[in-house]
């Protein structure tokens, strides 16, 4: 294949009224650089932000130039003489969402509406040697009744960019050439089935040709070679072959081995050659568990919501995706779910190299609960989404990382349509596992291989729905859900704990997007006098969120034969009214809460687990059960648990045992303490914090009855109980932080609490500078009062971390009646 690169400067003509129907010859226009978007080229309505702090402003970053209408691009191209008689294709790697093409004044084919795969136009016979004018009409309007929620088409994520990104080129092949190659590894791992589609220039008569195959390993060594004669009698001839591949190396997260299939097609004087990378792997379900090449796997995942804060459109080069997806691997994860969108080729190639298991979706999030159409409300859904699913399968199906497919996110409506799509694609392409939709517990259909939801058979499978149980001990699991669900279960969008936003990121938005939502957050904080506390707020809320993420993850790991979990998410989501739920920001940078090594200790392939109460007295024993989540490269053998219990730097107890049980007296403590329990198995270790309270009689405290008495004790010092009635403005407290976004799901709840752990009032009460489970009951039964704005004299012992939309500083004052 020869390539004629069309990147560079085109001419642009805007069409906000959608009044132009044809190019009308050559025209002058504004310069437009491809690859790129209208926003990057300064085309559209400039964004004017004047300081609003309303919910719409807080929705998401916005393009600096907005354009939602048809857009025309034009340029000349010089076709060399040796292109005569060749097959020519225009390749546009990614367009949002529709394109039409003219060569000179001739329209080529029909409008392509496609969000997930390249737009291609067959120009064979249309581009003779010499100069021609190419004209593109792009259209980013919602032509498919998608609504505005799916990550693949939403102002919350990519925004409605318009342009062409990635490769933009003319591809020139011989008239007889290989149009497509699909590789299907066999379950026995010693052969592959190869399906070729060859374009033939003389379909009016039978012809003959040869297809020669070579399979090379990662070092370039030829491991299989085969030649086949084929009879050709149609313009796109499909042939099926089986190639032996003995002693194949499997592709997986630990050994992401890939092979290269070289396909050479000869027909008369035409010779065409193409390369296809693939991995030897077979995914299956057995006994409600995932198996990859006969070995059980467990998914530890996060979600990618198509947020690209500098460009507003997906990265199209592999290096960018190696960095983006490599972060998930660095943090111990082996799985990424693409939320209501399908990434470009470069993402799959990077995941293949990294050994990541991908779940891919169409740009489909349709249900009336979020004020958009439901599945099937528009007749276009029936034809478009089936074709979209088939296109995704064909375009990216050879990638070994592409293990799971869902039609989209949280879909409701015509489930028979989703069933038709799933059954049809699964019948054609069995290389992955399928489910109707991500989320929503529903009666499972025969075409579904797994369930991804937050309820399974009516049972919750994320801690959001069982926080009280999780607070009692470290033993929560989802065994009931596994027992009552006939397929593997993946817990859906685990976490969503709001961390106070870091508005310092505003300076990092140096590209097409302007973070007016973060500018509004900053203004609200400045108005409330808390902007200078933002880093302390991030530390306190982030550490609480990290604690809760750890509990969520470990509940999944403790559940025997559980399919896995998907976090929402490792990184912030800056749309949907600003959901800063990540331990990393939207640029993939750490917030300084946990390092990758610390996170991997409880989210990696091998994780020691500890089941025990969280709160004890000094008269009790620490009774605990030990176990190992063991999904490493090889099963651990002859387990020995190395247990160290520390109070600060001092070792309280150290035990090595092969028995998975602990029975340790706590009577050696004569004071209240927080103990850090570390369990190590080989080179893997994990830690938990438990709280031990001295078994001492309650000490009676005087009760303050009037404001004057309260003022006196504040002046002279001392301890007293202050009833809530003395505070005119009572704000309920909470332990679990705001879910997702306090604007998307309106909430006045806090995001944690800052604690002056060294204050004498907390003497004898073990605590860090942020909340842990020993605070849960106290906070949930407490009220807070507001601190006067900019009152430096008030130094609270506890201060709530406010959510960014309800910013007045306030601190817990005592238990409610």
Residue ranges and their predicted role:
Residues 428, 568-631:
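Aromatic-rich peripheral "rim/lid" segments of glycoside hydrolase catalytic domains that contact
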Residues 4, 8-17, 29, 41-43, ...:
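Accessory beta-strand-rich segments of carbohydrate-active enzymes
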Residues 83-86, 127-131, 144, 205, ...:
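Short glycine/proline/serine/threonine-rich loop/turn segments at secondary-structure transition edges
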Residues 101-103, 190-230, 239, 621-665, ...:
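Beta-strand-rich binding/interaction modules
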Residues 726-729, 741-817:
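Catalytic beta-strand/loop cores that center a nucleophilic Ser/Cys/Thr
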Residues 702-741, 817:
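Short alpha-beta junction capping motif
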